[in-house]
Design a protein with these regions (language model features):
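Short low-complexity stretches enriched in small and charged residues
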Residues: 1-2, 19
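Residues in well-ordered beta-strands of folded domains
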Residues: 21, 37, 64
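Basic/aromatic-rich interaction segments and small domains that mediate binding to polyanionic partners
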Residues: 24-49
C-alpha cells in the first residue's frame, strides 16, 4: 500500500493530477476522508480513505503517487 500524505501529488487512473490538502473525518461515521484538489482546475474533492489505494479497472491503482 502506498503512502497517503498531506501535500503529496497523485495521478488518478483517468489522468488528472491531484494534491492532498487534508485528511478529515466524516461527521457522522468518523470514517477518514481524503480531501484533495485538482491541480489544473482547482476543484476540491473528498473520497473515503479506504478507496484511495483501491485497484480499479485493468488492475491499476485508483491513485498513483507522483511527488
Amino acid at each position: 500500500m502506498q503512502e497517503i500524505s498531506i501535500g503529496k501529488t497523485y495521478k488518478h487512473y483517468k489522468g488528472n493530477i491531484y494534491k492532498i490538502i487534508a485528511i478529515a473525518k466524516h461527521s457522522e461515521s468518523d470514517e477518514e476522508m481524503i480531501v484533495y484538489q485538482n491541480i489544473e482546475k482547482g476543484d476540491i474533492w473528498t473520497r473515503p480513505k479506504s478507496m484511495w489505494n483501491e485497484v480499479v479497472k485493468g488492475g491499476v491503482l485508483r491513485f498513483t503517487l507522483i511527488d
